[in-house]
């Protein structure tokens, strides 16, 4: 038996506490399902009490000490259920098996297995340390007695409704007309959707669409029928559906497309991408040689899509100043938005995206640009979750207009984590950045505090093709509808640069599509090298400019001092992957950027990040910088602080870094859902871009310690972890040379084939 005093002594011995900390409080150990142990304690630092936990499995040591809180974070309310729990008007039926289960630690695979053994099923992740689960009453009674369960309570229908819909019920609003609703079920596929569809029909409603590869459906319902549907255990969340809505010579110069990149031959050769809009004038002279390839149909108004397509792919025929970013593209693709279920069509967006990235299909696109979206929202909606779902599954670099509301009302697609959301500014028709200002583009942050937009560009005075005739142009296309295809075009150039070996050790496959980096890597490169405006200039706060304006001239200039992890290193919970870099004296900046794809968030939750990977950088003198800390109010990171537990994009930017060894850490703070489905373990992959290292080449296959040589030190590092798999604390993602989740004979073979060589 472990006494409280023994627990205290163990925790003090294992975990090094900050110098300013008092001895830990409330220290205890709890047994986890299987053979694991969790250590729980709290520390008082600066007068503030902070709870922590750490987990050990079997005979392995304890992993990272994770700071935590015990708040159930719902859109409906945030509460500590041991102190207060809401009693909503729309309460769960006593027969409902939907429950919130909160633990003392993050969600572990052992918890999921234990719930399944009781006849239950984990359906969705909630924060902090909680799940939505379907558990029969007998199983719930057992869970309440488990030491690793902190609280279990009902998941009420009130938690499933968009705020405006809930207000109608609570305020007894009568005569609400029938509407089309977007309904998200818990489980992927048609099984639950068809159960809900049958109930919709029995209530006199009409099913608008189902999504076989996804979890979202649409139905027209009366208010009374909606109340019945939201009470079903198959239903996770409901919000209102709405139809599709719409939201250049200087733009090419300011980001380096001309004259620098065009002079080097980067004008889109080999690049294939899609513009997703309403309709397009197929016969425009600027769209010939090659002609547009349609992704199925071309229906709807052609005015908006003609301009957005031209900004990306136009060849400048009849007006050279209106040339697009990729005039020499291999293939421009156009898709009409109203063919997909999000906008009233028959095709799920999952299927549409799968077709784009099918290596054996006709499109083979490396990016998509969308300047259309669903009606404005301040929230992470069922549509936002659907976007994160298909982009997580199919790894497409997708750019989405934030919109033009003048406030935080934005396209719900832009609130997705895995998309590149694009804001806008007024350049005043000059190349002088000092006169640029924000005007009316929608801005962030997202409802949960995540940084949006990601990037921005011109939203005024963009010269581009128009739909009036086959030779017509307009001089003042505007809005984030203009900014988004500009940014997408720059991504197209980045894919070409990658393919042609601008970044040593990357690219070089048969085609741009075959060479392409992961979408996270492209995003990390573009965000790291973007031009960041002074946050005091013209209303261009962090929430309005995001991480800045694409600057591929800068990216090209820094190419030889850039280290890249292209989702080739894996990480599991409680593990840290560590990288070291020698920074020469006189280096102007040291920048580290972490981006990871995340499974779709839970619309019911007030926190939409699922997994939590954190970035930490340590200077030669020991000063630590946490990702994003200080960057809301400055373009440079502040030392100290704490981990960012909401964003899936993290940066550390340091001006005039001290010469010497800098350490970059990627920490697996919380991995509760599989982020790297190619391996059977619960793990995640990520993109990491570090700019400011010395000129020596590092990071070729087998160079585990990143010193530019594959030698005895690297072989020793691999052999010390040989036989481990991702999920074990001793696993080292840098030694998993083929990124298959296991350090084995295949990795040793890669090492030996490179042994004795340099990078």
Locations of regions flagged by a protein language model:
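Autoinhibitory N-terminal propeptides
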Residues: 21-266, 271-272, 340
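C-terminal edge strands of extracellular/lumenal beta-sandwich accessory domains
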Residues: 518-525, 577-579, 608, 617-619, ...
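Surface-exposed beta-strand/loop patches in noncatalytic accessory domains
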Residues: 117, 121-125, 608-646
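Cellulosome-associated attachment modules in secreted, modular CAZymes
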Residues: 508, 695-759
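Bacterial N-terminal signal peptides
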Residues: 7-18
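Subtilisin-like serine protease catalytic core
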Residues: 176-177, 195, 260-346, 362-367, ...
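Secreted peptidase-domain scaffold signal
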Residues: 503-505, 513, 517, 534, ...
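The feature captures the short pre-catalytic strand/loop hairpin that immediately precedes
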Residues: 430-435, 457-485, 566
């Amino acid at each position: 038996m472990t006494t409280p005093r023994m627990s205290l002594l163990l925790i003090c011995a294992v975990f090094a506490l900050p110098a300013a900390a008092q001895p830990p409080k409330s220290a205890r150990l709890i047994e986890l399902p299987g053979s694991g142990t969790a250590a729980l304690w709290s520390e008082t630092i600066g007068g503030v009490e902070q709870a922590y936990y750490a987990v050990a499995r079997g005979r392995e040591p304890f992993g990272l000490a994770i700071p935590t809180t015990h708040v159930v974070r719902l859109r409906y309310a945030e509460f500590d259920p041991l102190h207060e729990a809401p009693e909503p008007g729309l309460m769960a039926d006593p027969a409902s098996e939907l429950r919130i289960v909160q633990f003392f630690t993050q969600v572990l695979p052992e918890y999921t297995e234990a719930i399944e053994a009781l006849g239950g099923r984990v359906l969705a992740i909630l924060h902090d340390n909680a799940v939505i689960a379907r558990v029969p009453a007998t199983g719930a009674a057992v869970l309440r007695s488990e030491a690793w369960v902190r609280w279990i309570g009902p998941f009420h229908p009130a938690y499933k409704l968009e705020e405006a819909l809930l207000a109608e019920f609570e305020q007894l609003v009568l005569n609400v007309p029938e509407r089309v609703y977007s309904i998200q079920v818990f489980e992927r596929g048609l099984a639950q959707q068809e159960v809900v569809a049958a109930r919709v029909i029995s209530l006199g409603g009409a099913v608008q669409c189902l999504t076989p590869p996804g979890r979202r459906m649409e139905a027209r319902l009366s208010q009374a029928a909606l109340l019945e549907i939201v009470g079903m255990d198959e239903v996770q969340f409901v919000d209102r559906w709405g139809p599709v809505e719409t939201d250049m010579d200087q733009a090419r110069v300011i980001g380096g497309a001309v004259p620098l990149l065009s002079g080097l031959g980067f004008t889109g050769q080999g690049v294939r991408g899609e513009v997703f809009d309403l309709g397009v004038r197929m016969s425009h002279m600027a769209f010939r040689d090659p002609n547009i390839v349609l992704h199925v149909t071309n229906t709807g108004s052609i005015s908006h899509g003609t301009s957005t397509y031209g900004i990306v792919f136009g060849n400048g025929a009849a007006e050279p100043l209106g040339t697009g970013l990729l005039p020499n593209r291999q293939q421009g693709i156009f898709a009409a938005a109203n063919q997909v279920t999000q906008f009233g069509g028959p095709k799920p967006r999952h299927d549409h995206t799968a077709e784009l990235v099918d290596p054996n299909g006709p499109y083979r696109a490396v990016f998509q640009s969308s300047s259309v979206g669903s009606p404005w929202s301040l929230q992470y909606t069922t549509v936002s979750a659907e976007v994160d779902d298909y982009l997580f599954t199919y790894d497409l670099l997708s750019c989405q207009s934030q919109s033009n509301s003048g406030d935080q009302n934005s396209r719900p697609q832009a609130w997705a984590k895995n998309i590149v959301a694009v804001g806008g500014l007024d350049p005043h028709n000059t190349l002088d950045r000092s006169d640029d200002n924000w005007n009316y583009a929608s801005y962030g942050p997202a409802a949960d505090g995540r940084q949006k937009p990601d990037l921005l560009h011109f939203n005024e005075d963009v010269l581009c093709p128009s739909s009036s005739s086959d030779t017509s142009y307009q001089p003042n296309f505007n809005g984030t509808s203009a900014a988004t295809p500009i940014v997408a075009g720059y991504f197209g150039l980045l894919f070409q640069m990658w393919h042609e070996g601008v970044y040593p050790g990357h690219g070089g496959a048969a085609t741009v599509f075959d060479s392409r980096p992961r979408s996270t890597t492209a995003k990390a490169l573009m965000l790291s090298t973007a031009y960041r405006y002074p946050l005091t200039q013209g209303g261009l706060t962090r929430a309005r400019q995001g991480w800045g304006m694409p600057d591929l001239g800068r990216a090209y200039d820094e190419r030889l001092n850039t280290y890249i992890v292209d989702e080739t290193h894996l990480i599991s919970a409680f593990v840290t992957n560590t990288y070291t870099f020698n920074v020469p004296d006189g280096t102007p900046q040291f920048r580290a950027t972490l981006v990871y794809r995340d499974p779709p968030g839970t619309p019911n939750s007030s926190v939409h990040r699922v997994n939590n990977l954190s970035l930490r950088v340590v200077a030669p003198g020991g000063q630590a910088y946490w990702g994003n800390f200080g960057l809301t109010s400055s373009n440079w990171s502040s030392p100290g602080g704490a981990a960012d537990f909401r964003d899936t994009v993290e940066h550390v930017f340091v001006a005039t870094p001290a010469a010497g060894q800098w350490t970059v850490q990627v920490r697996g703070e919380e991995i509760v859902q599989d982020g790297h489905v190619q391996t059977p373990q619960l793990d995640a992959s990520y993109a990491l871009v570090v700019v400011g290292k010395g000129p020596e080449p590092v990071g070729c296959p087998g160079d585990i310690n990143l010193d530019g040589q594959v030698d005895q030190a690297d072989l020793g590092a691999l052999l010390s972890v040989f036989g481990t798999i991702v999920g074990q604390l001793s696993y080292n993602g840098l030694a998993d040379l083929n990124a298959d989740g296991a350090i084995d004979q295949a990795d040793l073979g890669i090492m030996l084939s490179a042994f004795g060589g340099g990078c």
